[in-house]
Amino acid sequence: MSNQPFKFKQFSIDQDRCAMKIGTDGVLLGAWASLEHFPDSILDIGTGTGLIALMLAQRSDAELIDALEIEENAYEQSVENFENSDWGDRLFCYHAAFDEFVEEMQDEEKYDLIISNPPFYSENYKTGDEYRDQARFADALPLTELIQGASHLLSENGHLDLIIPFSEERKALEITSSHNLFPNKITRVKGTANSPIKRSLISFNFQKSETVIDELTLEISRHHYTEEFKELVQDFYLKL
């Protein structure tokens, strides 16, 4: 089933050649990301299927939405997904490692929004599937490298939006602080009201301000979603 096209309200995604399939984390980030500063240029780091870039193309009027993907199969598939969408003229995917991309682009015009659903399993466990491991494990793109690179590519009033494990939140805040990036909003995500917090959605920028912190609960019970979650993703999912 996971190799079938995933149909959203305004676009469809083929994912049969992508190691990491569409999941809740990516949809959450794409729907949650703040567009209140009306970004003209967006960069999606580690785009995979192209999901988040496509969601932001639907949500925003940004003239330029770049994506970056190191794994060849995922890169090729994201390009096809972009071309098959209504926003192909605004979407472009680079096939490169992040450090190479930063070195090449840091003297160019900066991005108003940089967004990433980064690989975050830092355990030594490997599945045996090289592409899935590369997509999933933090040693493929360490959080430190991601934040440092993003700080070089972000415009003065730009935002860096991430979804990370809640267990990594403190580490992320320490790293961003050392690069003069500060959290202006944090949403902590839990599966149900009684379950522990699993994820942190964080928006950073270069302006220090009081951090708005809230929580998002996804389900009341199995496949019975909360109104707040449905409201967040209602423009994307065909049904909930």
Curated annotation (Swiss-Prot):
Keyword field: Cytoplasm, Methyltransferase, S-adenosyl-L-methionine, Transferase, tRNA processing
Lipid biosynthesis found in the keyword field: no
Matches recorded under SUPFAM superfamilies: S-adenosyl-L-methionine-dependent methyltransferases
Pfam family, one: MTS
Gene Ontology CC entries for this record: cytoplasm
EC number: 2.1.1.223
Class of this enzyme: transferase
Claim: Mitochondrion is one of the keywords in the record: no
Record's catalysed reaction(s): adenosine(37) in tRNA1(Val) + S-adenosyl-L-methionine = N(6)-methyladenosine(37) in tRNA1(Val) + S-adenosyl-L-homocysteine + H(+)
GO biological process annotation, one example: tRNA processing
PROSITE patterns for the chain: N6_MTASE
Gene3D superfamilies listed in its UniProt record: Vaccinia Virus protein VP39 (3.40.50.150)
Compartmental location: Cytoplasm
GO molecular function list: nucleic acid binding; tRNA (adenine-N6)-methyltransferase activity
Entries under CDD domains matching the protein: AdoMet_MTases (cd02440)
Similarity comment: family membership: Belongs to the methyltransferase superfamily. tRNA (adenine-N(6)-)-methyltransferase family.
Known role: Specifically methylates the adenine in position 37 of tRNA(1)(Val) (anticodon cmo5UAC).
Name of the protein this chain belongs to: tRNA1(Val) (adenine(37)-N6)-methyltransferase
Phylogenetic classification of the source organism: Bacteria, Pseudomonadati, Bacteroidota, Flavobacteriia, Flavobacteriales
